[in-house]
Amino acid sequence: MTDASKRTVRLRAEHDGDNSRYLDASLDMGGSLVIKGQDLGPATAIVSSDGEYEWTSTFAPVDIPALVALLGGAEGADILDVLESYTDRRSYELERLIRDSDVPHSLFTWSG
């Protein structure tokens, strides 16, 4: 395992009453970028019967340069370094940019 595959960027860790929201990014062993989110609490009721909603967006290594460019990073920049500027409240902007872009990625969602 490389050092890069061990690194995780905490994009969001929010707590508001009974609700919590988390978002993390890391590189997997194959070099894909994996962004994982988890929402817990009554605010998830619209999508989850048990108070938990999870999702994972995965970007293949070949698509990471396009994501770096979308996020304003320099050519060749480390995606995890670029993502360091999208933490806390800015993590919502990150999600919007990804959602509105044509950068290829897979999306997996789970709710109880």
Describe the role of every protein-language-model region.
Residues 1-34:
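Short, charged/polar N-terminal "headpieces" of proteins
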Residues 47-112:
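Mixed-charge, Lys/Arg-enriched low-complexity segments
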Residues 17, 41, 63-65:
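Residues that cap or initiate secondary-structure elements
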Residues 24, 29-61:
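A short, structured beta-strand/loop element
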